[in-house]
Swiss-Prot record:
This is Alcohol dehydrogenase. The keyword NAD applies. Keywords: NAD, Oxidoreductase. The gene is Adh. It catalyses: a primary alcohol + NAD(+) = an aldehyde + NADH + H(+); a secondary alcohol + NAD(+) = a ketone + NADH + H(+).
Length: 254
């Protein structure tokens, strides 16, 4: 099993899907779970620690929109304490097409910067041991919710980035895969803004269709982590875990 005995960093591990997944990860017995999030939640950290006292759960304040140099600085602190990190989960995300710059900064640039920052410690060309990255993207990276085109585009960009660097694993020693949840019943989807208010009732319309619980999503998330398949595009929708076969329409040839 991949999770057991490992050191894991979970960016945004206290959110809706994030906290539920953190619970499932802790139950699977990692050595350390390090949660990076924008807001402290001591009660949640205590709950996670109590779920499995053999796991050390720690917390650091972190905003994915900080300069990459700040991320490297924080990672140096974590690596100095734990010596090794086996898995980085990038889970930060917002859904609000009124906030164009922040949506891109959190959903795409933040994922890129955090992934790039940890390469300083993992890249085998620098003598690093390699590692694994799991990036939470979205099914909107496959087909957009057209009323929130900024959100959908940011997730498509994160998916493209993830799939690209997975192909560099033989060079960097770092394997990568994407986690793409379908509509999950969290606070994120209950109230959000469409682009230019083209659909004021977008949340209500979206929730009129079947959704999945955050627990169902989290359980499948852990299954994907345990599968540990480089380049996998995982769809986590309506309680199912499916690997997506990406259709190639063009190839650079290099």
């Amino acid at each position: 099993m991949f999770i057991a005995g490992k050191n894991i960093i979970f960016v945004a591990g206290l959110g809706g899907i994030g906290l539920e997944t953190s619970r499932e990860i802790v139950k699977s017995g990692p050595k350390n779970l390090v949660i990076l999030d924008r807001a402290p939640n001591p009660a949640a950290i205590a709950e996670l620690q109590a779920l499995n006292p053999k796991v050390t759960v720690s917390f650091y304040l972190y905003d994915v929109t900080v300069p990459q140099s700040e991320t490297v600085k924080l990672l140096k602190t974590i690596f100095a304490k734990l010596k090794t990190i086996d898995l980085l989960i990038n889970g930060a995300g917002i859904l609000d097409d009124h906030q164009i710059e922040r949506t891109i900064a959190v959903n795409f640039t933040g994922t890129v910067n955090t992934t790039t920052a940890i390469m300083e410690f993992w890249d085998k060309r620098k003598g690093g041991p390699g590692g694994v990255v799991a990036n939470i993207c979205s099914v909107t990276g496959f087909n957009s919710i057209y009323q929130v085109p900024v959100y959908s585009a940011s997730k498509a960009a994160a998916l493209s980035f993830t799939s690209s660097i997975a192909k560099l694993a033989t060079i960097t020693g770092v394997t990568v895969y994407s986690i793409n949840p379908g509509i999950t019943d969290t606070t994120l989807v209950h109230k959000f803004n469409s682009w230019l208010d083209v659909e004021p009732h977008v949340a209500e319309k979206l929730l009129a269709f079947p959704t999945q619980t955050s627990l169902a999503c989290a359980k499948n998330f852990v299954k994907a982590i345990e599968a540990n398949k480089n380049g996998a595009i995982w769809k986590l929708d309506l309680g199912r875990l499916d690997e997506i076969e990406w259709t190639k329409h063009w190839d650079s040839g290099i």
